[in-house]
């Protein structure tokens, strides 16, 4: 009973962070299962496993997207690593609002249940994660499926807003003595910028899907031209949230990668202030480029010119970050442990994803490539090999601190190489499919596309083997006896620890700091 009470009513940031990790792992496995079903259907031309049920295919795609974005990456990155390490890194005893932290987590399981139940009601919600009307309207999706998906989004949105309020308050008000803003670790900065993005963008999504809900159920016509509405308005509202959302997914990863590159190159991060301002710039610019998702809806030519230019400008702060990571490694004494492998893999693959993003920023090119597999390849390079590689990197980097035990290094490296090979084999051929004009969200295709699709599907099976390796690593690390206890500072940064988490025991005490740490060292 006491154990149940501890986990249900916990107000401890580490316990809640652990709950987020467990939740993210469960949702991630479910999302992976959906993605494998998608790739099995696309493994060869014709109907493979879904018996020609195109609606079911789109339900799988929608569920895969929602699970991976709202129930895997965000809970693990912001809820998991954020809750676990932001208070420790700034020298705070806990989060500012511990009970708010508890409900932020417990809103997510009901939200997940609503999403899964939407797939089981009538024909499911086959709208894609964008939920565009008129496809998501009551004429095209009668029944309760889309409404359940909307309520699911509302709940996870409220969870994220409450969490972001908590992080902003904690980082501004609960830093230890001497921890000025310009001494904040980069991961804390990344969570702060992410929290602001969430706070500003999610209410817009909430407004859009609430309008959609009333259109469906109460006969309003916000998005129905028959009553003077406009479905393009929904697209503007959705993407005003949706574009900052992709930066919400990747920014905490930037912070994690900065820590890892610095630690394993044995050097402080190159251009700390530049890194901070680059993240802030990405956050601001992220709100000014949303219509690049809408080049094909008939925007004015001047509007398209602006959004093309603005989108390309976002590449500048992103490039600053990438070159700063490379400069940090330059001349460093690099150790290729598992976290560093994932970090280098992240930098390499995220750069490829960024370059295809520059291609898609051109409105003229995008008109040809929009809604083809080129776009799928682009955002999976950014997310499936950006955000997810950052998650794995952070896991291997901090797992000793979380469990108090070291992970098996060889198995970790095997996990990296299998996953690296698998995801590249899955997503690189999609560029060729997209350039050949293969459209997204369609479960069948002409025979001409068969070769690359077969390769892509094979790659996804390899990725699953890699993920299975990962869970083997988790099982071995978390079980006692098979591996040695983790030192306070497993990466040998005792001589010059730049961040506070390496000064506390592994795992940290239930209350991390007996007294507040005073931060005296200036940043070199």
Swiss-Prot record:
Lineage: Eukaryota, Viridiplantae, Streptophyta, Embryophyta, Tracheophyta
InterPro entries xrefs: Cyt_c_oxase-like_su1_dom, Cyt_c_oxase-like_su1_sf, Cyt_C_Oxase_1, Cyt_c_Oxase_su1_BS, Cyt_c_oxase_su1_dom, Cyt_c_oxidase_su1_bac
Enzyme Commission number(s): 7.1.1.9
Source organism (scientific name): Oryza sativa subsp. japonica
Catalytic activity annotation: 4 Fe(II)-[cytochrome c] + O2 + 8 H(+)(in) = 4 Fe(III)-[cytochrome c] + 2 H2O + 4 H(+)(out)
Pathway assigned to this chain's UniProt record: Energy metabolism; oxidative phosphorylation
Record protein name field: Cytochrome c oxidase subunit 1
Binding site for O2: 247
Binding of Ca(2+), residues: 41, 46, 443
């Amino acid at each position: 009973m006491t154990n149940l009470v501890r986990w249900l009513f916990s107000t401890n940031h580490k316990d809640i962070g652990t709950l987020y990790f467990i939740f993210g792992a469960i949702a991630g496995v479910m999302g992976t299962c959906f993605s494998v079903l998608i790739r099995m259907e696309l493994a060869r031309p014709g109907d493979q496993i879904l018996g020609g049920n195109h609606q079911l295919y789109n339900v799988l795609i929608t569920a895969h997207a929602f699970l991976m974005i709202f129930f895997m990456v965000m809970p693990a990155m912001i809820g998991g690593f954020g809750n676990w390490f932001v208070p420790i890194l700034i020298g705070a005893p806990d989060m500012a609002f511990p009970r708010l932290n508890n409900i932020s987590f417990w809103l997510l399981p009901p939200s997940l249940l609503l999403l899964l139940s939407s797939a089981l009601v009538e024909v499911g919600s086959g709208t894609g994660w964008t939920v565009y009307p008129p496809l998501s309207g009551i004429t095209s999706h009668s029944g309760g499926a889309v409404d359940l998906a909307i309520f699911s989004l509302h709940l996870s949105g409220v969870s994220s807003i409450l969490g972001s309020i908590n992080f902003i308050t904690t980082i501004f008000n609960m830093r230890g003595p001497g921890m000025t803003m310009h001494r904040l670790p980069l991961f804390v900065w990344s969570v702060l910028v992410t929290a602001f993005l969430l706070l500003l963008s999610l209410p817009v999504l909430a407004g859009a899907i609430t309008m959609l809900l009333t259109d469906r159920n109460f006969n309003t016509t916000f998005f129905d031209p028959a009553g003077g509405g406009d479905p393009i308005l929904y697209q503007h509202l959705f993407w005003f949230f949706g574009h900052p959302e992709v930066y919400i997914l990747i920014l905490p990863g930037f912070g994690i990668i900065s820590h890892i590159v610095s630690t394993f190159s044995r050097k402080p991060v190159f251009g700390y202030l530049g890194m901070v301002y680059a993240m802030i710039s990405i956050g601001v610019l992220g709100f000014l480029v949303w219509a690049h998702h809408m080049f094909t809806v008939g925007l004015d030519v001047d509007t398209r010119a602006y959004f093309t230019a603005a989108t390309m400008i976002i590449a500048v702060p992103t490039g600053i970050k990438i070159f700063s990571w490379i400069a940090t490694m330059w001349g460093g004494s690099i150790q290729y442990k598992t976290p560093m492998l994932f970090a280098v893999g992240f930098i390499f693959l995220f750069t490829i994803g960024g370059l295809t993003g520059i291609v898609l920023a051109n409105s003229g090119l995008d008109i040809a490539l929009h809604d083809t597999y080129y776009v799928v390849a682009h955002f999976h390079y950014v997310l499936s090999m950006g955000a997810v590689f950052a998650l794995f990197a952070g896991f291997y980097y901090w797992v000793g601190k979380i469990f108090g035990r070291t992970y098996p290094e060889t198995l970790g490296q095997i996990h990296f190489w299998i996953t690296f090979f698998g995801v590249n084999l899955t997503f690189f051929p999609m560029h060729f499919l997209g350039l050949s004009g293969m459209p997204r969200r369609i479960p069948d295709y002409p025979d001409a596309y068969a070769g690359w699709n077969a390769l892509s599907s094979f790659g996804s099976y390899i990725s699953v083997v890699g993920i299975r390796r990962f869970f083997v690593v988790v099982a071995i690390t978390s079980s006692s006896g098979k591996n040695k206890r983790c030192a306070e500072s497993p990466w040998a940064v005792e001589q010059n620890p730049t961040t506070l988490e390496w000064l506390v025991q592994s795992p940290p005490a239930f209350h991390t700091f007996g007294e507040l740490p005073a931060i005296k060292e200036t940043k070199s």
